Amino acid sequence: MASLSLKNVCKVYPNGFEAVKDFNLEIADQEFIIFVGPSGCGKSTTLRMIAGLEDISSGELKIGDRVVNDVEPKDRDIAMVFQNYALYPHMSVYDNMAFGLKLRKVPKDQIDKMVKEAAKILDLTPLLDRKPKALSGGQRQRVAMGRAIVRNPKVFLMDEPLSNLDAKLRVQMRIEIAKLHQRLGTTIIYVTHDQTEAMTLGTRIVVMKDGVIQQVDTPQNLYEKPCNLFVAGFMGSPQMNFLDATVKVEGDIANLVIAGHSIPLPPAKSKKLIDGGYDGKVVIFGIRPEDVYDSEMYIETSPQSVFTSTIKVYELLGAEVYLYFDLDEFPMTARVDSRTTARPGDTVKFALDVEKIHVFDKETEQVITN
């Protein structure tokens, strides 16, 4: 197993397009790191540079203590699992898993042992004689992972491995990959655009946009303490509610004035706005849907954060309900208990958890309070 280090790594294509910009990251041995971001943000390009499938334009990549910028992919001691499985259709599951070992001239008895061990880990033993066309999508993806496991690499790279699977299979395979990481204790770098995969699998998440790292943190910290507007909006579904608000300072308390409502902030958040000189300025106010309540208990205990709106859309998702409405001209979403009596057309009172309010600078989009 191995640690990785990327220092000032850049990728510039011949046409001048800068796909990855000054990428700096230290990955510890046995970490499960997720690269997440929208399409075209540079996450797969970064993974391919680590794999050696893309040249590094500038900067330094280390695997363990060795600089590998100019090392061939086959000599980096890594294994990659692709989105499209990349299985040989004419070979059996056994032969697909054994192929890389045969190329490396591993003894036949050792190949047999390694393939069968990997097959046992991934529950593929009954399928070893089958061809890929006789397998389901989830089984094919397990074969692709098995082919990587048998090599016993220092690092696993996974490029959107679950994106071709249906929703139910994706959940099953997420669990399988988590178990695999626990069992093998290996370093995994995993690329996805799916924030659910990122939040559930990663020990740390790297959020990217336009080739630039926005934030690197644990899933919980990313969700609760986003560093800017992009991270706050990208992580979480439904996404965070954003509204323009004007700061009005009264003594040592900062109020957010939104659509005629004045919401006093807690002392710690107030201090950051006051110290930052935001009195009278327009800021961006953010709050997650689960921190908007329609229950009487919250309405009674948080009277200063209460507002009224008319429900536009009601979505039932089993144990919870999404309520969609407007606050002034700003669209809002509340994630509430399924026992709510609110329905489209109803005028409903809502209360906010002021401790969970995020405030962002309107110009820089950086967080002011967390």
Spans of model-derived segments:
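ABC ATPase nucleotide-binding domains
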Residues: 73-234
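Helix-to-loop junction immediately C-terminal to a conserved catalytic motif
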Residues: 51
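Short coil-to-beta microelement around the adenine-binding A-loop and adjacent beta1/P-loop entry
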Residues: 16-18
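ATP-binding/catalytic-site motifs of ATP-hydrolyzing domains
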Residues: 60, 66, 212
